[in-house]
């Protein structure tokens, strides 16, 4: 009888995969790296914070295996747990850059962001994704989703960034959990009590049909290990996060104004071949094309008068308003959009894939230039799209394409400067903003930065909204306002004096000056990664203290 992989705990899964006796756990339970943010909320922590990291070999190939414990906080990512993954992948990247091949294997059993640490989770997931994009230049990054919790939220965006994804039939993979979709969009959009609907939409068998999972294996340690070995030896890579034209040309053929039948989608997908898709065109018009904070700031930072895009929700344009010629990007609402779940500015399928297409075009244009153009990201995104069609097709893949394209540009030498002028929420922020080299934010009460709406967070964490608000007074990372967000060290520049979102002459001048400073800082430091987020003064002294403690521990133990 073969040994079940699904039934094992995270540490057992890691040990089962590694060659005996090569496994060596790093920053383990005896290091007592617990999550102080959980303790502050009266939540019992774990001494390993639900993440197991071990170095060793699999079939004599050097690996670092990272596994999430789904039974602790739903496998959610907070500051300490995220920092362990970031530190391990950082070392793996350095090893590969130095010619020492080491394969990252990531076992996902996670609901995504740990809502009790919210913004720490979003920051960590963006930094993990950045490292995966960098690592794939050297080795395949292999993901495994055994089952139990499955893979949801921002970590599903991460799964789509990986080279190759292996699951058992007990796994589910999606961005928005069924309960969250029901909370945000209503039971008619997705009935979270309908188990057949859930498994037929996001279950592993359907995910293979939908080309979201690469390999489905029968549940056993031996089968999972064999699939991992084959992926390493054959250097398998589905390039799922570099597939914008494929999906854009597919979406153009589908009627997404109503829920699609699963079989109809599978047939359309199976028949589809990639076709070239024209880039959006942005022109000036006599009247505004839409109304939003992001639209106003795009107009102000490009100098375009009443810009209108052939893709109504996705905008980009050249700008000479900064110290260097730049490209400005944004995502805006369209109240008449046939894809009804993105009418208020949410980031959906088209938005993710279109932004990736635009960014990849910029990458190609500047590939042979010594100096790469800055990208100025105007951030005003209320959330990702919560919808049945979005989950069926794989909205997390769309968001991964956008995130990967931003990361690719930054790693190639483009300063990517994010300007938070409106809301910056959840997967939308991961796709459009959190891969920025530097973040700048207005000091406006109207800005919300978070992983989930209060209503959904209340339902998932089983706490009242009043309890969530009370906890936020102790733990800045779960607050919803931009001033608490600034305490985390994530912002390069917090514009105290810009207390409203309007594009007055003074406000625009202040933002342009801050963007110019950020571009200069990136150029001066030759910074192509995201380490500035946790090495700046605010982060070191207050915002990312635990992140830096984990980094020190990992440095001590990596080669010990």
Task: Describe the function of each predicted region.
Residues 65, 103-107, 142-144, 166, ...:
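Structural motif
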Residues 99-117, 371-392:
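Short, glycine-/small-residue-enriched flexible loop/hinge segments at domain edges that mediate gating
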Residues 58-83, 322-353:
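STAS-typified acidic loop motif
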Residues 49, 77-100, 345-369:
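A short, well-ordered alpha-helical element
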Residues 1-29, 33, 183-309, 462-560:
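Amphipathic alpha-helical segments at domain termini/boundaries
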Residues 92-106, 129, 133-137, 371-374, ...:
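Glycine/small-residue-rich phosphate/adenosyl-binding loop
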Residues 112-241, 387-506:
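Conserved catalytic cores of soluble enzyme domains
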